[in-house]
Amino acid sequence: MKATGNFEACRNVDPMVALSDKTRAHIDHWLAKFPADRKRSAVLQGLHAAQEQNEGWLSDELIAAVAKYLDLPPVWAYEVATFYSMFETEKVGRNNVAFCTNISCWLNGAEDLVAHAEKKLGCRLGESTADGRIFLKREEECLAACCGAPMVVINGHYHEKLTPEKVDELLDGLK
């Protein structure tokens, strides 16, 4: 399954059905922070909430539902979903693990930690574990935590100053 940006089949999506109460409440919370004529300012948060609702990825239907809820053309929301690396447009493992491999992390051993995680999980960057528990995201160029290098983001939470033992502990703790 993969979001394709073909919204013809989603033309009649009802955001009140496709989006959970929790997702709509999250979007409404963010809409309240912006002027009424700036609904598109909440698209990032809307997509985040929809992705969380859908166990870590965005389908065409959810992208279209967020867009309709915000009175936007679906392609606008799709462009955001496919531009930012924080969004997944195909089904992936339940837990999203992203190692930073930029210069600070690389100089502090990120390459070895990625190899360690790949061996431990039995999958490579860009793949999910066979049981669907973990998605080892493609390399992240920079996650803006150079002072804590090497680091990883797991389900949106930063973990810094990693060692192989700490990586094991983090990965073993994911359900």
Predicted feature residues:
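Signature of N-terminal electron-transfer/Fe-S-associated modules in redox systems
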Residues: 1-175
